[in-house]
Amino acid sequence: MIIFTLRRLLLLLVTLFFLTFIGFSLSYFTPHAPLQGASLWNAWVFWFNGLLHWDFGVSSINGQLISEQLKEVFPATMELCILAFGFALMVGIPVGMLAGVTRSKWPDRFISALALLGFSIPVFWLALLLTLFFSLTLGWLPVSGRFDLLYEVKPVTGFAIIDAWISDSPWRDEMVMSAIRHMVLPVLTLSVAPTTEVIRLMRISTIEVYDQNYVKAAATRGLSRFTILRRHVLHNALPPVIPRLGLQFSTMLTLAMITEMVFSWPGLGRWLIHAIRQQDYAAISAGVMVIGSLVIVVNVISDILGAMANPLKHKEWYALR
């Protein structure tokens, strides 16, 4: 396990190193780039040294430090993605197992059809439909933002629910509920695609495990179906799925950009899209580095967790994964 982890960490460092060239190219080769006046080597050394000190320069639009802007928008995106990913796991794992154990029966067909429908719906269209129904028609949920305009929450961690909870305001409970209400539609929109993919992965893995002889032997010993599912099926069906969850989280970061634009969520994706529109290359470079690094780190962590859950993966060569 130690060798496997070291290989993954080495792959992480090498990939991050090559990612720096992409980020640097946006600060050097683009028109009116901030580092264009220096030589290529000196510009890269200066840029990389700033990267190590979390210094991405200043925005060419408003003159603010990009690192300070990232501190404001990055937690908002992470809060949205973590909640959506958690919802996808809580729903996708049991529903996928149900589809697997009822293979070719009506529950499996219904779940598979519903998952296919959810996967095929465009994110922006789903967001508009949910907004039209729950916000504009029923008036149950807010349309945009993180809090109601009545509340002023001091940002401490950048996570809306946590900041509202640790606030010393007499309206703390109301602020927490306001934060939750503002998150319902963005989280629901963002969680649909990963939920359907988790359902598909768990269904395939459950079918493979359910046909194994040790599961049939457990049934002949008189164990209940719930015990078989909990002890044997879930324990063996989940490890092959874990390494693929990192890819789903990475995909969700891309979908978060669209979700943040529709719901005016002040996150990293919305900030990066505005930077692209305004041709703020220093901000674009910083956004690419942060998102790319997060994607790489999440995938490496998912591989390590998958290997810990499935010891047979320890001996696989990382270049073949």
UniProtKB/Swiss-Prot annotation:
| Any one of the GO BP annotations | protein transport
Q: Which family does it belong to?
A: Belongs to the binding-protein-dependent transport system permease family. OppBC subfamily.
The family database entries (NCBIfam families) matched by this protein are listed as: PRK15110.1
* GO CC field: plasma membrane
Source species, domain of life: Bacteria
Corresponding gene? sapB
Induction (UniProt): Part of the sapA-sapB-sapC-sapD-sapF operon, RNA detected in mid-log phase cells.
Which InterPro entries does the protein's record reference?
MetI-like, MetI-like_sf
Protein name (Swiss-Prot/TrEMBL): Peptide transport system permease protein SapB
An annotated Gene Ontology molecular function: dipeptide transmembrane transporter activity
Q: Which residues lie on this side of the membrane: Cytoplasmic?
A: 1-8, 102-113, 196-248, 302-321
Key words, A-Z: Cell inner membrane, Cell membrane, Membrane, Peptide transport, Protein transport, Transmembrane, Transmembrane helix, Transport
Q: Which residues form the ABC transmembrane type-1 domain?
A: 74-302
Localization, per the record, is: Cell inner membrane
Q: Does the keyword RNA-binding apply?
A: no
CDD domains attached to this UniProt entry = TM_PBP2
Mode of membrane association: Multi-pass membrane protein
Q: Which residues cross the membrane?
A: 9-29, 81-101, 114-134, 175-195, 249-269, 281-301
